[in-house]
Amino acid sequence: MKKTALTYLLLGGILMSSGCDLVDPTEVTNPNLTEEAILNTNNPMTPWVAGVKRQLALTVNAHVTFLEIGSDNYENVQTFYNQNLDNLTIRPQDADINGFQFQLGRLREMADYGLTVVKNADPLTTADQEAELNFYKAYSYLLSGEYFSFLPVTAGGEAVEWRSILGMAVETFRLAESSSNTQISAAASLGIARANYRLGNKAEAVQAANSAISKAPNLVYYAQFDQAQGPVNTMQTALYDRGNFDDLQVLPRMDFLDPKYYFRGASQASPVAIFKIEEAHLILAEAAISDNNLNSAKSVMTDIVNLVGSRERSTFNNNQQDRTQLNPGSRPNNSDVQVRFSPGAPLIEGLVLDRKSGNVTVPTISGTSVSVADVDALNDLDDALETLYLMRQEIFIAEGRRLADMGIKLVISEVEYLANPNIDAGSPGTSPVIPPFIDSIKDELDAFDYDAAAGICTIRHNINRILVENKTSELVLPFH
C-alpha cells in the first residue's frame, strides 16, 4: 500500500510538471557518453578500476564520521554532523544511515559491473584488475555484515542475514588474494581474518591473520583522498579543517591520539587506513586469551606495542582546537591533567596534550597508551582482555571501527524499504541491535567528570571493562 501510494505521488508530480515549459533532462543525450561508446574506448578497465577506487573513498566518508560519533570515542558538540548517533538513536530515517547503505551498494555494484560488463568489453583486462575489483566488492560485503543485522546485497533484493554476508565477504576476498600486488593480497587475507573474527571462526581467523603477517608485516592499506579535486577526507574536516568549531571532542583518555587526520597541504588530504597489520596481531592475541594462554597473549601484545611504537607520528599546529570553547573549564586541555578510566581506577598521566603551547605530535597510523611494562604486569586473563580491547580502541580510533566492537548494528534505511518490494517496515533488520549493557548507559557513553582545579578527569564508564564483563554475550567478543 505504501509503495503504491508513493508511486501515485511521484506520477502526479510528473504529470503536473509536464505542462510547464521546462527542459526534461532525460531527453538530453550526449552520443559520446553512452555506455556503448565508453566500453568501446581503448582499455576501459583501467579508468573503471580508478573510478571504483574513488568510490571506496566515498564509502569510507559515508560511515567513518557518524560511526565514530555513535561510539564512546567522540562526542559531537555542534550541529553540523549527525545529531542522533551520539545517544545511539538509530532510526531508519537517518540520512547518514541511508547514505552509508547507498555507498555500500554503489561500491558493490560498481565492482560487479567491472567484473562482468567491463571485463567482457576489454580484452586487455588483467588478473590483477579483477583481483582489485573483487577486493572492493568484498570490502562492501565486510562493512555490510559488520554494521547491519540484515541488508540486501543485490539491487531490490531480499535482506540477507549478517553472518551470510560476512561469508560472502570471505569468499570474495579469497578471489582478491591472488593479486600480485602484495598490499592488496595481504589486505584481502586480513579481510578474511576480520570477517572470520566477527563470525567467531577462531581457527580460520588465526590462519588468515598469520597469512597476512607473512605477506606484509607492516601492512597499511589506505583509502586515499584528494584535498584539491575531491573527495576530501570527511573525518579530517570534522577533526581539523573546521577549525575552532571543535565539532567532535575526543574522550579525554584518548586525547593524545587526536586528531589522527590533519591538513597536509592544498593538494594532499590525510588518508584513512582500512586495513593494517596491527589487526592481525590483535586477532592472534585474543585467540590466545580465549585459549587461556596468557603467556602467548602477552607475547603477541608486546609485539603489538612495539609495532605501534614504530608507526609514523606527525607534528603540526593544533592550537585552533579549543577543548573548552563552548563551556570553559569543562574539558581537560593541558598535559598536567590526570585521567581515570572509571571511578576508583588509578590516575594516569600523559593522556592529554597541550594544544595552546606549540605544535603537537600525534600518531597518524596507530597509537596506544599501553606500554611493554603494562603488558608484562598482566597476570589475569580478563585484565589482559580488557587491555587488549583498550588497544583495539586506541589503534582503530577515527577509523569507524569501534561500534562493531560494542556489538551495535544499524538498521535498513527507510529509503530502501520504501523502494524495495522485498522489505517492509517490520522486516528483520529494520530495528537496531544494541546490547542491553550498552543500551542502559547509552546517554553516558562519552560522559566524564572533570575537576579542573585538581586536574583530575574521571571517565564515568569503562566500556572495555563492561565488554569483558559481558564477554559471554553473543553480541560482543566473538571468541568468547
Question: Which residues does each PLM region occupy?
Answer:
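Hydrophobic-face positions in mid-chain alpha helices that act as interaction patches
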Residues: 200, 204-280, 290-293, 298-378, ...
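Inward-facing hydrophobic residues that define packing positions of alpha-helical scaffold repeats
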Residues: 108-111, 166, 173, 209-210, ...
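Short coil/linker segments at helix-helix boundaries
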Residues: 93-99, 144-172, 203-207
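Sec-dependent bacterial lipoprotein signal peptides
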Residues: 1-20
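Conserved, well-structured interaction surfaces
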Residues: 44-48, 81-151, 174-182, 272, ...
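Membrane-proximal, proline-rich intrinsically disordered regions
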Residues: 20-68, 414-480
